[in-house]
From Swiss-Prot:
SUPFAM superfamilies: ACT-like (SSF55021), HD-domain/PDEase-like (SSF109604), Nucleotidyltransferase (SSF81301), Nucleotidyltransferase substrate binding subunit/domain (SSF81593). This is Bifunctional uridylyltransferase/uridylyl-removing enzyme. Modifies, by uridylylation and deuridylylation, the PII regulatory proteins (GlnB and homologs), in response to the nitrogen status of the cell that GlnD senses through the glutamine level. Under low glutamine levels, catalyzes the conversion of the PII proteins and UTP to PII-UMP and PPi, while under higher glutamine levels, GlnD hydrolyzes PII-UMP to PII and UMP (deuridylylation). Thus, controls uridylylation state and activity of the PII proteins, and plays an important role in the regulation of nitrogen assimilation and metabolism. Pfam families: ACT, GlnD_UR_UTase, HD, NTP_transf_2. Signal peptide: none annotated. Disulfide bonds: none annotated. Residues 706-789, 816-891 form the ACT domain. GO terms for biological process: regulation of nitrogen utilization. Residues 343-705 are annotated as: Uridylyl-removing. Keywords: Hydrolase, Magnesium, Multifunctional enzyme, Nucleotidyltransferase, Repeat, Transferase. One of its GO terms (molecular function) is [protein-PII] uridylyltransferase activity. Gene3D superfamilies: Beta Polymerase, domain 2 (3.30.460.10), cca-adding enzyme, domain 2 (1.10.3090.10), Nucleotidyltransferases domain 2 (1.20.120.330). Its cofactor is Mg(2+).
């Protein structure tokens, strides 16, 4: 604990303050306020964090001692005030609980009841956040024996006031000779850590990590020290060096990592004004600035700060693994004779764990740095790596240099790992964990811990990359065939599966460099393939996959898949079935690895539709594109067959169809054409809009709900419809809008409920939607107001300037308006309102929500049903959209991009 520091607490001055005041509370509060201000100023000036949190604990010691002395405990009283937990370690952050144990000699508390109650009341009155317990020595023993948390807390204790003999007796009766022997304690603590890690999804890379509890956080360091304390009676990192569990460099790294997390935690408490261990988005930017990070041309300050954070916790996790493995070998020795199984001259198994056969293996044969991972992939029964071998791996990383990277033995071993029938993902993770992967592939090293500061990418780039490879491996499992039927079928027939894993490893390798990461990554992928002696065709395929890994997802979500030209253009890009197969599988894995919430039946079916239509185009031959007239005839013939079977007159159907135009038949299936036609012909001609709702049968929108609206066209049709749907808590995924020559609108919307599920066959919900839409369309003057809902905290934090792009599609004679904006409740209704103000008609729309942002595409025309040709109109439209979508945004706007 620190020496006396009068600037923090001056006993003489404090006693004088007490004498001047009628109530002691004001003097105590002033003293607390003073040391808090001094410590916060010292923190802001960059003082040593270890000293700061120890100084805070010392200050609280002084306050407690002064408070304790105000009560009559009796002469030679057997009562002791003990600091426990983190405060017992002498570590205290600004708003951490002050954990106290009032320790008694006997269970008879009656003689001390009044002073104890007065003491605790005073602590609460002066503003100390106290967690307290009152126990006898025997009660401590009983509760510690039954509760892992209690024994852990009692292991870290200091006497603040009263005789220390009581604390010593308590430590003696709760020692490992009486309860929780080191083996039992180790197993319980290891299980506790596993449960805690599972709570945080077993990853260091959560978007809003908990600096205390998340994997790699402060609790992982404390867990190591608790285990050491129970085994050796020591409770600091240097003791682990003396016991041979750490080397000096590892001890220094753990200490500096702990201090970094302490600084982050201190800053969190200071910024939040309360105990806060979650590194929330609200605080990440503030702490980045506080720590001196600045934006540059490539990365935001917050991204650089978070990369530092993730690399620190990754390093802590790595050493936590190493030390716990070492503890396991020491504390849990095998009761059976040691089983040694040679693998080759360099490696052997000891009780199922792989280890080197001698300490100089890596020095004499550096290729063994890669060979060990290939062996583990080839022998999935291997439980893990022995602690000494993990340390040798870490200490031998410097042997991986340019000469090593170009040695054919090493390049061959690395490719061999990708050809393994199992264990690819597991051993790439191990390589990353032990620092080998980033050393062997420096370009991978650059993306370790790199976070993209948004809600769309919920993992760092390296974690996302390894998750993608994990997902590719999962597609090979039979149990995945139900959820991913097409991808599972395709991956089984890929001629060279190793190529998809290499493409997955490199698809985001150039993130964070500036420029187009797909283009830059393709160059890196090509260089990798060439240096690893892959044939030219394989090299071209991998490089092409990296360069185009976003194209299939973008096409499926933002283009009209019913347009034959869209399919033809995509088929031209793909070129052949092999490229299509590889790209489809990579895209499925990429979406799932980016953010699990992104993958739903709607996105799945979009991709499947694009794959199927492109496959047909390739089989037909790119020189034989789809004939629009033939496609229309096929749709009409199939629809007519259904209608005639249902008793609909052919002439009536064809009369209606003559008013609908070609686009209607290109953008709807025969089944939907028949459904619409029968309902329209049977609908009374009384001006009431026709609203049909069902689960969609379209392959690209399975599990969505289809809403079909047929009504007299009106200029506010789209605006009123989307506003009404917003009020009905519907999320629009796709819109297909047709205006007939008789001035009737035929709109089809694919929707999900706001929670992402389909409406299903719920009669009450369907009736509510139908009635709500009919009422809105019958009374357009009562245009539904936009619902003002609370913007979620995370969305508020990721506000950015809306971007609006307007271009002209000369072939289809429409303007294409693309909106990229922060997601907000009622956003589509706001856009519809702007279209209404500008007298614009929406011909088609593609809706995509990606994390905190929406990327919507609208195909629009002016009042004369022509593309927007007036630059001034486009600028005013853009300005209006940006202003509307910037509400509650707090960001500057971006100029439009208009292409005619």
């Amino acid at each position: 604990m620190p020496q006396v520091d009068p600037e923090l607490f001056d006993r003489g001055q404090f006693q004088a303050e007490l004498a001047l005041k009628s109530s002691p509370i004001a003097a105590f509060k002033k003293a607390i306020r003073q040391f808090r201000e001094v410590l916060d100023n010292r923190f802001n000036s960059g003082r040593d964090i270890r000293r700061l949190i120890e100084d805070r604990a010392w200050c609280v010691d002084q306050i407690l001692q002064q408070a304790w002395q105000r009560f009559d405990w009796g002469d030679d009283a057997d009562i002791t005030l003990v600091a426990v937990g983190g405060y017992g370690r002498g570590e205290l952050h600004p708003y951490s609980d002050v954990d106290l144990l009032i320790l008694l000699d006997s269970e008879d508390q009656e003689s001390f009841r009044e002073p104890i109650e007065g003491f605790l009341t005073l602590l609460w009155d002066i503003g100390l956040e106290v967690g307290q317990s009152v126990r006898s020595v025997q009660q401590c023993a009983e509760e510690a024996r039954a509760d892992l948390t209690v024994i852990t807390t009692l292991m870290e204790c200091r006497t603040i006031c009263g005789p220390d003999s009581l604390r010593q007796r308590m430590l003696q009766v709760t020692g490992s000779a009486h309860m929780w022997p080191s083996k039992e304690f180790f197993l319980a603590k290891r299980h506790e850590q596993q449960r805690r890690h599972a709570k945080y999804n077993d990853t260091e890379y959560n978007l809003e990590p908990n600096v205390k509890g998340s994997p790699g956080g402060l609790r992982d360091i404390q867990t190591i020290l608790w285990m050491a304390r129970r085994q050796f009676g020591s409770l600091n990192l240097h003791a682990l060096v003396r016991e041979g569990f750490l080397v000096e460099s590892e001890c220094s790294m753990l200490a500096s990592s702990q201090e970094f997390l302490w600084r982050v935690r201190y800053a969190l408490h200071m910024l939040a004004g309360r105990a806060e261990d979650r590194l929330l988005f609200d605080h990440q930017r503030s702490i980045a600035r506080l720590f001196g990070y600045e934006d540059n041309d490539v990365k935001l300050a917050v991204e650089r700060f978070m990369q530092k954070y993730y690399r620190v916790v990754m390093a802590i996790s790595e050493l936590n693994d190493l030390i716990i493995q070492h503890f396991e070998e020491v504390i849990l020795p095998c009761e059976q004779p040691v089983q040694i199984q040679p693998l080759n001259s360099r490696f052997q198994l000891r009780d199922g764990y792989i280890e080197v056969t001698h300490p100089n293996v890596f020095k004499r044969t550096p290729f063994a740095l890669l060979e060990i991972f290939v062996l583990m992939a080839q022998h999935p029964e291997i439980k893990g790596v022995r602690a000494d071998t993990i340390r040798l791996l870490r200490d031998s990383r410097h042997l991986i240099d340019d000469e090593f990277r170009h040695d054919i033995r090493n390049t061959s071993l690395f490719i061999e790992l990708f050809k393994s029938s199992q264990g690819i993902h597991r051993n790439l993770r191990r390589m990353n964990r032990y620092g080998i992967l980033g050393r062997y592939l420096p370009e991978f090293g650059h993306i370790i811990g790199q976070m993209q500061h948004d809600l769309f990418h919920i993992y760092t780039v390296d974690a996302h990359t390894l998750n993608l490879i994990k997902h590719l491996r999962k597609l090979n499992r039979p149990e995945m065939a139900e959820k991913y039927p097409l991808a599972s079928k395709i991956i089984d027939r890929l001629p060279k599966p190793e190529l998809i894993y290499i493409a997955g490893l490199y698809h985001d390798i150039a993130k964070g460099r500036g420029g187009d990461h797909s283009e830059l990554g393709a160059v890196d992928a090509e260089a990798f393939c060439q240096s690893h002696q892959l044939p030219p065709w394989d090299t071209q395929l991998v490089s092409w996959l990296v360069q185009n890994h976003l194209v299939m997802s973008t096409t499926a979500q933002r283009k009209d898949l019913s347009d034959p030209q869209v399919i033809f253009d995509f088929a031209q890009l793909v070129g052949d079935q092999t490229h299509l197969d590889y790209l489809y599988v990579l895209t499925v894995a990429d979406i799932n690895a980016t953010n699990p919430t992104l993958w739903n039946s709607w996105r799945a079916s979009l991709l499947r539709q694009l794959y199927t239509e492109t496959k047909r185009a390739l089989r037909r031959g790119l020189e034989n594109p789809v004939d629009r007239e033939e496609q229309i005839r096929q749709t009409q013939t199939a629809a007519l067959d259904q209608l005639v079977r249902n008793g609909i007159d052919q002439d009536d159907a064809e009369q209606l169809w003559s008013q609908l135009g070609d686009d209607y038949f290109l953008r709807h299936t025969a089944g939907d054409v028949a459904w619409h036609t029968e309902a329209i012909l049977q609908h009374p001609d009384d001006g009431t809009p026709l609203v049909l709702i069902k689960e969609t049968t379209q392959r690209e929108f399975e599990s969505g709900s289809q809403i079909f609206i047929y009504a007299a066209d009106q200029h506010d049709f789209f605006a009123v419809t989307v506003a009404a749907m917003d009020q009905l808590n519907l999320s629009i995924q796709d819109a297909r809008i047709i205006t007939s020559t008789s001035q009737f609108t035929l709109d089809t919307y694919i929707v999900l409920d706001a929670d992402g599920d389909s409406i299903g066959n719920n009669p009450e919900r369907i009736a509510e939607i139908r009635e709500g839409l009919i009422d809105a369309l019958k009374n357009p003057d009562d245009y539904p107001t936009i619902i003002q809902r609370r913007v979620p905290r995370q969305l508020k934090h990721f506000a950015f300037a809306p971007q609006v792009t307007i271009s002209t599609d000369a072939l289809r004679q429409v303007s294409v308006l693309e909106v990229i904006a922060p997601d907000r409740p009622g956003l589509l209704a706001r856009i519809g309102g702007i279209f209404l103000d500008f007298d614009l008609s929406v011909q088609n729309a593609k809706i995509a929500t990606l994390g905190e942002r929406v990327e919507d595409v609208f195909y629009i025309t002016d009042a004369r049903n022509q593309p927007l040709a007036d630059p001034d109109l486009c600028k005013r439209l853009q300005a209006a959209l940006v202003e509307q979508l910037s509400q509650d945004n707090g960001r500057d706007t971006l100029p439009t991009r208009i292409n005619f």
